[in-house]
A protein has these predicted regions:
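Non-catalytic accessory/interaction domains
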Residues: 2-327
Length: 327
């Protein structure tokens, strides 16, 4: 209201709005906070570690390469921190590290509590290990999602070992949220590209063990009245187990579902049909490729043609990938 009254029928600059908000809220440095977010590229990484009975927070620019990470840019970062079951604590992190006294130095620490901040978080190993399966149940959905997403991006940035991400992921056996599983799947898929041979076989087993509890809870058969996100979660879990986990039983069931859908499309839930197509293609051979290629060429609707084309892109064979590129 102050902003509208002051500049009624006039022209303004961006900073006029920040100044008006700052005047309304009092001592908060709104203008410097917003300027640091708008007038420089990138976004911050807030690093958290425990020293004695203190939580120490500092920042650097987040980046996937050393040149970006060494950028000296500093943001005014409003940070919400929750320690154990205590109320959230709010602070403004600038160039100097912030130290928070901890009543319980062994408590679970959640930086970016509530998930509202536009920054990534890097926990040191000691803090990361506190996110046990029990502790994860005390986090909100967005907090769990960001924990996984930040950890995987740290792996991509070569700031966290893939084994550490996998260890964190394995604590999510009680997870039933589709968005969180999407983040987990992205990381597991990426790790699968990094290993081969015996290590890849061991990774697949660990993925199957991770997915099995959640897939057991949601089941293969859609329940009456279930929501669309439950159906999407089922499809995602089946795909992760069958493709990333190499679950031969899941692969077999997907082939059976696809055969049933070919005979009677209404007999299989659309999400399971889409999943079955993905799984059969990702684990398929030349015969499967020819099947989807025929469907692509004979499709009588744009939707059916796209579905077949997407299936062709899932095949792993270098020769088949090249055939798809040459279409």
């Amino acid at each position: 209201r102050r902003y509208l009254r002051t500049h009624e029928h006039g022209n303004t600059e961006t900073s006029d709005l920040w100044d008006a908000i700052g005047a309304a809220v009092g001592d908060e440095p709104v203008r410097s906070l917003m300027d640091s977010s708008i007038w420089q590229p990138g976004f911050p990484l807030v690093r958290a570690r425990v020293e004695g009975r203190e939580l120490v927070l500092d920042q650097q620019r987040f980046g996937f390469d050393e040149a970006t990470r060494s950028d000296p840019s500093i943001w005014q970062v409003p940070v919400h921190v929750r320690v154990g079951g205590a109320a959230e604590r709010r602070l403004l992190l600038g160039a100097e590290p912030q130290r928070l006294a901890l009543d319980d130095p062994a408590a679970v620490v959640v930086v970016n509590a509530g998930g509202h901040g536009f920054y990534r978080v890097a926990y040191d190993q000691a803090l990361r290990e506190r996110f046990t399966a029990d502790a994860l149940r005390g986090l909100t959905t967005i907090e769990r999602y960001q924990l996984v997403d930040d950890a995987w991006n740290a792996v991509v940035a070569e700031q966290l070992a893939a084994a550490s991400f996998l260890g964190l992921a394995e604590r999510f056996t009680g997870e039933d949220n589709h968005a969180v599983w999407q983040a987990l799947a992205a990381g597991l898929r990426g790790i699968g590209r990094l290993v081969e041979g015996d290590a890849h076989a061991a990774l697949r087993q660990r993925i199957r063990d991770l997915v099995a509890p959640a897939l057991g809870r949601v089941g293969w058969t859609p329940a009456a009245g279930e929501g669309p996100l439950t159906a999407k979660l089922r499809g995602l879990l089946v795909s992760v187990s069958a493709v990333l986990g190499g679950d031969v039983d899941a692969q077999r069931r997907c082939r059976e579902l696809l055969a049933a859908a070919d005979t009677d499309p209404a007999s299989v839930h659309p999400e399971l049909v889409a999943t079955a197509i993905n799984v059969v293609a990702a684990t398929g051979d030349d015969t499967d490729y020819e099947r989807f290629l025929g469907q692509f060429r004979r499709a009588d609707t744009p939707q059916a043609q796209l579905r077949a084309l997407y299936a062709l892109a899932e095949f792993d064979s270098e020769v088949l990938v090249q055939r798809t590129c040459d279409l």
